Amino acid sequence: MQFSDPATVLIITILAVTIAFTAVSLYTAFGPPSKQLADPFEEHED
């Protein structure tokens, strides 16, 4: 498999960006930064 093929480089780049975005999203949602997230339903007064 050659990595010099433009299509292969594009696919690997798209996969890397997608995996990185998913990892950061999961870390933000469930990791230590999730304590800083506000819940709008709990803050809303009826």
UniProtKB/Swiss-Prot annotation:
The chain crosses the membrane at residues 10-30. The keyword tRNA-binding does not apply. It is found in: Cellular thylakoid membrane. GO terms for biological process: photosynthesis. It is a single-pass membrane protein. Keywords: Membrane, Thylakoid, Transmembrane, Transmembrane helix. Its main location: membrane. InterPro entries: PSII_PsbN. PANTHER family: PROTEIN PSBN. Belongs to the PsbN family. May play a role in photosystem I and II biogenesis. HAMAP family: PSII_PsbN. This is Protein PsbN.
